Amino acid sequence: MDEGPHLITDPAVFESYSQDFVIHAPYHGMNIASLFESIRRASVEVMIDCFAIASEIGAPVVMHPGYHAWNTEKEAADRQFEKSLHQLQESAADHSLMFWFENMGELNYFHFRTPDDIPSLGDTGFCLDCGHANLNHCLPAFLETDFSHMHIHDNDGRTDSHSAIGEGTIDFHPVMAALERAGATAVLEVKDLEGVLVSKRLLESL
């Protein structure tokens, strides 16, 4: 997560580790679909700064697709998103990296909440967030799509709790089957270390 106390300012921090990395771009204060052009441009610039660091360590980037404040602004915000998308695609090509948009939670001002929104991403891949899809009651439909990466966590279908596997209502048997079929990468996005360890054991037993 490239923000707050985890803001990445120097890719050298990764040199001590042998893991493969996926960087989640900053999202607080960011809106690549903003109707305020200065905010949209600044948000894109922050994403491109993230691309520059990610390219140094060979990591793909996950980002949020933006949001709109009022339903009457949705079409205009979609056009702003499309403008940002083209700029981000050009920058990703310049940096020789992949980036993916994450499907968002249940709040209706978010862009990209259901599989119906996938065409708006063009030829850019996406990160299937299982918990967010569960909140929007469309996880089975998402599992039938061609996703590139997956965020794994559980919830009760009402709150984006990022709970450990088994603490919510998601059936992870079809989730793991879809992950294997897609050949996608995945990360556990559980709120604490104990939950990560429990989740890892349960997923390995499936």
What role is predicted for each listed range?
Residues M1-D49, T124-G125:
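N-terminal pre-domain/capping segments
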Residues F14-H28, F81-A92, S120-L121, F172-A178:
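Alpha-helix-loop-beta-strand connector modules within alpha/beta enzyme cores
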Residues M1-G4, P26-H28, G66-H68, M104-E106, ...:
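Active-site beta-loop-alpha junctions enriched in small/polar residues
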Residues T9, P65, N71, S163-A164, ...:
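Residues lining hydrophobic/aromatic ligand-binding pockets adjacent to catalytic sites
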Residues N31, A76, E106, D160-S163, ...:
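Conserved short-loop catalytic and cofactor-binding motifs
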Residues H24, S43, A54, F99, ...:
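Conserved, mostly hydrophobic/aromatic
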Residues P60, F112-C127, A133-L206:
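Histidine-acidic metal/acid-base catalytic patches
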Residues A33-G125, R181:
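Active-site acidic/histidine proton-transfer and metal-coordination neighborhood
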